Amino acid sequence: MAARSPPSPHPSPPARQLGPRSPRVGRGAEVHAMRSEASGFAGAAREVVADESDKIWVGEEGSGGRRGPGGAAPAHAPLLSAPMGSRRLEGISVEEAMVTRTQLLEEELSSLKEELALCQADKEFVWSLWKRLQVTNPDLTQVVSLVVEREKQKSEAKDRKVLEILQVKDAKIQEFEQRESVLKQEINDLVKRKIAVDEENAFLRKEFSDLEKKFKDKSQEIKDTKECVQNKEEQNRLVIKNLEEENKKLSTRCTDLLNDLEKLRKQEAHLRKEKYSTDAKIKTFEDNLIEARKEVEVSQSKYNALSLQLSNKQTELIQKDMDITLVRKELQELQNLYKQNSTHTAQQAELIQQLQVLNMDTQKVLRNQEDVHTAESISYQKLYNELHICFETTKSNEAMLRQSVTNLQDQLLQKEQENAKLKEKLQESQGAPLPLPQESDPDYSAQVPHRPSLSSLETLMVSQKSEIEYLQEKLKIANEKLSENISANKGFSRKSIMTSAEGKHKEPPVKRSRSLSPKSSFTDSEELQKLRKAERKIENLEKALQLKSQENDELRDAHEKRKERLQMLQTNYRAVKEQLKQWEEGSGMTEIRKIKRADPQQLRQEDSDAVWNELAYFKRENQELMIQKMNLEEELDELKVHISIDKAAIQELNRCVAERREEQLFRSGEDDEVKRSTPEKNGKEMLEQTLQKVTELENRLKSFEKRSRKLKEGNKKLMKENDFLKSLLKQQQEDTETREKELEQIIKGSKDVEKENTELQVKISELETEVTSLRRQVAEANALRNENEELINPMEKSHQSADRAKSEMATMKVRSGRYDCKTTMTKVKFKAAKKNCSVGRHHTVLNHSIKVMSNVFENLSKDGWEDVSESSSDSEAQTSQTLGTIIVETSQKISPTEDGKDQKESDPTEDSQTQGKEIVQTYLNIDGKTPKDYFHDKNAKKPTFQKKNCKMQKSSHTAVPTRVNREKYKNITAQKSSSNIILLRERIISLQQQNSVLQNAKKTAELSVKEYKEVNEKLLHQQQVSDQRFQTSRQTIKKLNLDLAGLRKEKEDLLKKLESSSEITSLAEENSQVTFPRIQVTSLSPSRSMDLEMKQLQYKLKNATNELTKQSSNVKTLKFELLAKEEHIKEMHEKISRMERDITMKRHLIEDLKFRQKVNLESNKSFSEMLQNLDKKVKTLTEECSNKKVSIDSLKQRLNVAVKEKSQYEQMYQKSKEELEKKDLKLTLLVSRISETESAMAEIETAASKQLQELALQSEQVLEGAQKTLLLANEKVEEFTTFVKALAKELQNDVHVVRRQIRELKKMKKNRDACKTSTHKAQTLAASILNISRSDLEEILDTEDQVEIEKTKIDAENDKEWMLYIQKLLEGQSLTLSPRLKCNGAIVAHQNLRLPDSSSSASAS
């Protein structure tokens, strides 16, 4: 069969960019992943069928999936690169996959059709030949010409294929050179980018240094503010001392007024009892109303919660139905694909059956032809035996004839002597000599023939044998004639003595004796010479036949080897083509990634990615060695053919030289025999001339042989140089591959550097945010300083208000004198005073209000009403301000009014209460966080802040007694002036604000410390993993080096024939370990506890400065990290410069090699010119030989007539033999192909079934994992919603309780105010003026209760709105969470399909 080129591939799909896959929403991504992996399995099966020579499952570069027939992931072609897992195209839909599948099937069908057409053409050709041969008188020449033309077409097709392959190789070399240039440009671009990045880093460092300078300036400003605060506190102490002296003077006045008040209290006691009874009744009614409203609100909240739960569950059910429908569609699609695969396999089975039937038919035809061939071969063998017997008989006859010829020659010499005597006698008798006739036979001018073919040599052999027989018959006839002539000559000599007549010499007997004797002698010598020449020719022709047969054998061997190589190349080409198709379908990578060598530790696992990658690497090396081996075999075959041709040419030249010598000797002999009468000088001159010619010819032959030797040596040298250049080219290719690998590593390193730079920029931005937060803390400290300045202003105003309040505070002196001892008690004594002392109720209520406020602020600081978020530093400043406003307003709510103008001032206090409520609500929503989010963050961060809260509680407990001691001393004046109480409350508020700010700073610092610790642990873990990988890679490198040594030994054994060896060394670069410095966090010990509040403030400021120093130390550590990374970047730059130097050196080497190539080409040109000159000389010699050959052609024509029949039969025999051999080869090829197709189909079916089963199992596992993750996520969401709802309810209950307490406190205040004498007098005067009873007047004054009821209603409505808002937020979050959960589930499923080992990490995330 003629060698056929494989079908041209369809145009590849456009290459898509690689990168991290964007997961689709829903379960579409899972389906797509399953489909893409199914196509990958099919491609792997095709690869196994195509490349049977090396059945190694090749892994994808950097792929996470397993390879091999039992692996879960598909095996891809070795051309697939990758860096990085088994990646698939994402955007391919089901229809596109089906279209690609149909295209592949159409290509396979077209290739099968072409093969069938070629088989049919071969079959028809054989049948036509058979029909022509079956005719009675077949035209064998036509048959032979048809076969020769067919073989010529096949050889031409093979040569075209070889040329196409060479062109493809040249194109690939050009592509590689272009890629080298592109990669160099990319390196230059990367260097420019690095320079730009370095400039940006330097700019950022400058900015950082400027920020540090600013920070130092601000720290100095804080120190200055501390000093100012200390000075102001000393001034405040002096002012307080002056006020205490004034209070002592006022206390003496108060004692006088208290005596008057005791008289009036007895009258008021009776009135109070009546009022208390009425107030108790009103309270009971109000409590009942409040409880009823609460029950209604609770029922409404439950109803809303249940409705929300119903809506959520309905949406979840709808989503689950949608998921079920999607899963059903996917199952249907998979079933359809399975059915299509089954139909395809059935069609292929039918095709295989048809091929088997065709093979059976061809086998029958070949058997019939073999029978015919055996019959013909038997007949030919019989003919050959008969001819051999005849040849042996002729040889024996020739020996006998030679003996008879020698005897005849002796007789001829004797007769010539007798004839000479007779001639002398005749001359004497006649008186004048007759000239001897000179006969020149033109038939003996022989010429050196051109190179005869095998058939012409065989015909020569047969013709010369027939000539020998013919000459033997002539010799017999000549012997008979000689005997007759001798008898006639004797009788004639007797008669000539008796007679003396002059005219008798013209009689016929005398004529015969004179004319026939030289002719007969000449013919005898001619016949002897012809015999010798024929024997020599036979020997030469036998030698030429042997050489030609050797040539043919070597040519046949070379052609068979070339055919085998072509078949190998065809199979490899098909395999590569299928791999290219798979690569184009699987992943259109623009960058061809080279397979990295695996670590030795990774090779310990039997079925790992590293093992498959290593196998792929060795497979490539094996393929390269096979290609080299094939090239060397081709060169060996060509050299063998050239040697055989040279041998045949030398033999022919020797034969021509021998024939020339014989002809010259023969001619000289003829001249000697014919010209006996001429002088001997001419003969000697002729001999000398012939000898000179012979010597000249011998010298020419020797020079020609020397030149041929020199040319052979030059050819050998050129071959060696070509081999050396080939080895250099291979080394350069390997160097380019290593360079490409190194460039890829450099690019990866630059990408890592860019990632590190981005991480550093993120860290710098975080540090900038921290710096801004510190700036805001400084601003808050400035605000505290301003508040301290503002504290002085109300103290000055208090001096002015003290003179006005002297008359009003006269009644308070007696009370303050009685209850001085009670104000010095601790908190426990305050509680005991509440239970035991009913008389001192007013004073205890005052102290209790202060205590409640302190508890409220402590609860606020404990429960985390301050903002906990680290990133939003703006919100921290806002929360600190809102906290201050809330605390001030709540303190205004609780503060009692002692003046007589309390009724007028009640309205603004109520307004402040409403404002405080609104501010509380706004505070809850300031940061953009809902209370749900806030409490979620709080619960997430509780364990990290437990230690801090304990410390803060301890410090608050230590600070409480100091505050109580100060309040003991101050409460004496607090009963005299309300302004002092307000100042104290403002002081408390400012201190609590500072506490909250410092707590926030501490929390943020601890969070940053924990984050840095976690980052450090992760980096250490990564370092350990990288060390393990490095050790495994070393071990694998050692093993692979040993394997490489073995392979190199085999290669050297192959290259011993051509005396060229090449050694390949592979070095593995060690990855530089990047050490990250650990972040050291120095814990600062708390300073001493101060006795006074001012010292506590200093302590807190010191803590703030300590935290600032901590952060500055963190900044320094980050600086050190930056420096380390800069050093790493410098090292990378140095590596790049080294690589560039290596590249330049290798370029110089390539240029030197190119120069050497040019020199060699010039020397080749000179040799070619020499060869042309020699060819011209040979042509001249051949022309001379052709001139001499004309004389031989006449004899050949006589011989050809006798030899034609024999040559025709022999040609028929040889042609039939060759045809049978070709048919045998075709049969073997067809049988091998059929077996290959059967095995391939079986392997495809097994692999497809296994892979479909594995895909089904994987899909089931992935679906189960995704369902489990979804269930867990839904449970967590439900728990979170229940937690948030419970929290909201508890908050509402707490708010209601606080409101009740506020109302009770207000009522107590009113009752207390009613007990005062001034108010009693005012009420009596008002009743007397208006002519109204006291009870009517109290009813008129009780209008405030209705206002309070309305406020409670408004508060209840606000609470309802808040609950609804929380429920809406929960609903919105559930809706937003559901698609996210779906996306996460899809991503997890996709990762489980690709990397089953990473499923646990994905579910945890």
Swiss-Prot record:
The gene is CNTLN. It is found in: Cytoplasm, Cytoskeleton, Microtubule organizing center, Centrosome, Centriole. Residues 61-71 have a biased composition (Gly residues). Residues 1-14 have a biased composition (Pro residues). Interacts with CEP250 and CEP68. Interacts with NEK2; the interaction leads to phosphorylation of CNTLN. Signal peptide: none annotated. PANTHER family: CENTLEIN. The modification Phosphothreonine is found at residue 1343. Residues 95-126, 613-655, 681-793, 980-1311 form a coiled coil. Required for centrosome cohesion and recruitment of CEP68 to centrosomes. It comes from Homo sapiens. The modification N-acetylalanine is found at residue 2. Phosphorylated directly or indirectly by NEK2. This is Centlein. Residues 877-895 have a biased composition (Polar residues). Its main location: cytoplasm. GO terms for cellular component: centriole; centrosome; cytoplasm; cytosol; extracellular exosome; nucleoplasm; sperm head-tail coupling apparatus. The modification Phosphoserine is found at residues 5, 22. It comes from the Eukaryota. Residues 1-79, 421-450, 493-529, 865-917 are annotated as: Disordered. The lineage of its organism: Eukaryota, Metazoa, Chordata, Craniata, Vertebrata. Residues 48-58, 896-907 have a biased composition (Basic and acidic residues). Keywords: Acetylation, Coiled coil, Cytoplasm, Cytoskeleton, Phosphoprotein. GO terms for biological process: centriole-centriole cohesion; protein localization to organelle; protein-containing complex assembly; regulation of protein localization; single fertilization; spermatogenesis. One of its GO terms (molecular function) is protein-macromolecule adaptor activity.
